[in-house]
Design a protein with these regions (language model features):
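Mobile gating loops/cap/lid regions near enzyme active sites that modulate substrate access
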Residues: 206, 211-244
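Substrate-gating cap/lid alpha-helix
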Residues: 174-213
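Serine-esterase "nucleophile elbow" of acetyl-processing enzymes
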Residues: 24-87, 104-106
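Histidine-centered active-site loop/cap adjacent to the catalytic His
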Residues: 232-274
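Oxyanion-hole/transition-state-stabilizing segment in secreted/luminal serine hydrolases
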Residues: 96-141
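Structural recognition of the beta-strand scaffold that forms the well-ordered cores
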Residues: 42-46, 80-85, 112-117, 165-170, ...
Length: 274
């Protein structure tokens, strides 16, 4: 019996000493999480009244700020918009600003992406000058001049940023619902957009965003809304600003934003690594 007690006592002492000699495992080292530094990208919006945001009841700049917000929400980093839209500008006037505005040049140098609305005032000027007898032949020379200006705008915008992705927004026909019989104007709009798309196809990472089909028939292409006053029926394009029936309203700008965003999402893999 004494032998058994001695044996058990010796065993307990041995186990205690063995455990005491074992190294104590140190806590697992965890790599501290580094605070991610949020990157800010510059988004340059250049153009005419569509870029300025005429018709936007919030006076915030039409599609520009909501596009920047969507880009920030869907990508890493924050997209900070700088709006260089001036209502009434033709392609020649936009080009002139591009040559002279040093702040615009500086922003383009560091820009991550650029949108361009151009051409609508060039065509509008032709239509106004030939309102009673407008024909497609009237746009030949202005379209040629516009094409030359568009090429130079793209080239100068990339002077210090050669891989800058540029999204050129097409023009639309705001007169269609009230003057559907003026088919020559719609044909001119189509031809203008086709020429724009053909012209920018000569450049790498310059993309065309068509918007005519989104706006010229009203929301969802439902031919607008009819209003009757003094026995006369007026068709209202519910995608356009009521005050002038020419520029997009908030809904119209939302549709523009979505079209540009979808084009960016479909093409950004070609430029996101540059």
């Amino acid at each position: 019996m004494q032998g058994l007690v001695f044996f058990l006592t010796s065993l307990l002492v041995f186990v205690f000493l063995f455990c005491a000699l074992l190294p104590i495992a140190s806590p697992r080292m965890t790599k501290p999480k580094m605070a991610t530094k949020e990157v800010t990208y510059t988004y340059v919006a250049l153009g005419d009244s569509l870029t300025e945001g005429v018709g936007d009841s919030t006076k915030q700049g039409g599609f520009v700020p909501i596009l920047a917000q969507s880009l920030s929400n869907e990508n890493d980093g924050q997209y900070q918009p700088v709006n260089y839209g001036v209502a009434g500008n033709t392609s020649a006037q936009i080009l002139d600003r591009l040559k002279k505005q040093t702040d615009l040049q500086k922003d383009l140098k560091k820009a991550r992406v650029m949108t361009l609305t151009v051409g609508g005032n060039d065509l509008r000027k032709v239509v106004v000058n030939h309102l009673s007898d407008f024909s497609l032949s009237d746009i030949q020379k202005p379209l040629k001049n516009y094409t030359a200006n568009l090429k130079e705008i793209i080239t100068k915008a990339r002077k210090d940023n050669p891989h800058l992705p540029i999204y050129v927004v097409g023009i639309y026909n705001p007169l269609y619902l009230n003057f559907p019989e003026l088919t020559s104007i719609q044909t001119a709009v189509d031809r203008w957009n086709e020429t724009t798309e053909e012209t920018i196809a000569q450049f790498d990472q310059v993309y065309f965003v068509p918007i005519n089909d989104l706006l010229y028939k009203g929301i969802d292409g439902k031919m607008g809304v009819s209003e009757i006053s003094d026995g006369k029926t007026t068709v209202i394009n519910d995608a356009l600003y009521e005050e002038d029936s020419f520029h997009p309203n908030n809904t119209g700008y939302e549709k523009m934003k979505q079209a540009i965003l979808e084009k960016i999402n479909a093409t950004k893999k070609t430029w996101s690594q540059k």
